[in-house]
UniProtKB/Swiss-Prot annotation:
Broad class of the protein's primary localization: cytoplasm
Domain of life: Eukaryota
Assembly and interaction partners: Homotetramer.
Protein encoded by which gene: GPD-1
A Pfam family assignment: Gp_dh_N
Protein name as annotated: Glyceraldehyde-3-phosphate dehydrogenase
Pathway, per record: Carbohydrate degradation; glycolysis; pyruvate from D-glyceraldehyde 3-phosphate: step 1/5
Disulfide cysteine pairs (residue numbers): none
Cross-referenced NCBIfam families: GAPDH-I
Keyword flag rRNA-binding: no
Positions annotated to bind NAD(+): R12, I13, D34, R79, N315
Record's GO cellular component terms: cytosol
Subcellular location: Cytoplasm
GO biological process, one term: glucose metabolic process
Amino acid sequence: MAVKVGINGFGRIGRIVFRNAVEHPEIEVVAVNDPFIDPEYAAYMLKYDSSHGVFKGEIKKDADGLIVNGKKVKFHTERDPSAIPWKASGAEYIVESTGVFTTTEKAKAHLTGGAKKVIISAPSADAPMYVMGVNEKTYDGKADVISNASCTTNCLAPLAKVIHDKYTIVEGLMTTVHSYTATQKTVDGPSGKDWRGGRGAAQNIIPSSTGAAKAVGKVIPDLNGKLTGMSMRVPTPNVSVVDLTVRIEKGATYDEIKATVKEAANGSLAGILGYTEDDIVSSDMNGNTNSSIFDAKAGISLNKNFVKLIAWYDNEWGYSRRVLDLLAYVAKADASK
């Protein structure tokens, strides 16, 4: 039986989570909340997407929500999460995708309306973070609010795990070459303390900070303090790429490392970690459901202990699929208790 899900925040991730849910056999979205748009506009935004194309299905608007592929989706417009009547539509698991309620205290407000559990689709300062294929098995059901970490952590962590398990990472640096996002500016404008972040997204390569590499230490405790990184925001609308440069304890040729990653991609991490030897570019990865796609031809090694590894990720589509996979995993674990 499908898990009944509510989505709070119908922005980029909220809508892409919805699109992925339509394809996910274990998930049924029964309610959406967004105080800034009405159902008619929500239907339009769900149907048409500049990066992912026209919705493959039927969307209709009715009196109090949407009908998607014949199924009713209740639409709410509450600003306060505690006021959203999730129970009325049967939504038990909530995807918190506003980018605003990212702490346990703020996200717990959803429980007031009848939700059982909240999954934050962003990093959290205090909620337990889980990355599918890395540490989801440590979930014990005690926390009401959990985080799916960031799209970049979801790309980096599975690859780092494979390398660390086989060769032991001594230390490493990561750079994510990241497509621009909604928080950036279309033209130069004020941006608080991040002056570079206020420059036009489509005109510049913008150095930026990211906590994605450090967050790997939270999901792989053995790597805590051994990885850090930065971001380069670039003028592409979707798909990003991680450059992970590491020093490894157990020496290996690049071909040996490729074989290790390929084995994991075809085995224990199938559907999470991809592997390709094709001459791909970023747009080829648009719509890819993996968290991370290892580019075997793009990496290089200096010697047997120092290597640069490259992995692509659709920072919208792949990440949103993992949000739902984590949700389905958690719901199944909760039901077995």
